[in-house]
């Protein structure tokens, strides 16, 4: 399809013939999907990884009618089960994954180190697909409404307090918040859920989870419905949709952690397959449909991380920042 559109630019028949002769070697080796593609996601239904990929892949399928993506949810081990499957998959373009940054590239190395088969740099990177600020939300019955109130609460509570979290980045936000706030970790605990939707649903319920941490993109429907209260967001900027809510700042420090999703292929994927995914997925991020979808759902694109090199550089910075804290909180020793 791509080459046909390219040839239509030439009106002279002889030029078309010459260009076609030059393109024959490329046509002979260019890869395109001819059967369904399995998309591994290591979360329960409703994660940002899943909903974001569904939106982007709809654009890709519109431009490539033969591309058929079958999402396979494989939760467990904070996405390790899904990524072990990707690691073992044939590098033929028919198995891909959409994992989260923090789990895959930082915390799996510490908290799931005995479960994983892969190194953080084992996979073939296409690039980042989107990011969303994380947020701290509270059950509507909680007396806490602001970040300063929450800081005081985790310092001085005299009864058990439980946070719900749905991923590695969410757990890291909890740990950093408690570390900077000098919170009482004997009484303030975090309970891990298999996905962010499950974590925010638990926070909204009467199950005893007073607070929750998850992407604001996933919490938004329950925030807007009044089922949970938005306390604060990660990063240094306000979220336009919630102008009255301040970024989380603890003892002068912002929490620079985001929910972030990437497109990865198995180790050793050939360059022609990499080229197809790059050519189709990265431009789709700037399509009018995705631009509007991301705006509506509080997701943004870090364009520096939409190339393999830029993405790899971003991951190294992420590891340099957050590996030390994850090593302080070794779940295998708790």
Annotate each predicted stretch with a short phrase:
Residues 31-121, 167-170, 180-213, 222, ...:
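N-terminal (or domain-start) structured segment
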Residues 1-14:
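N-terminal secretory signal peptides that target proteins for export/translocation
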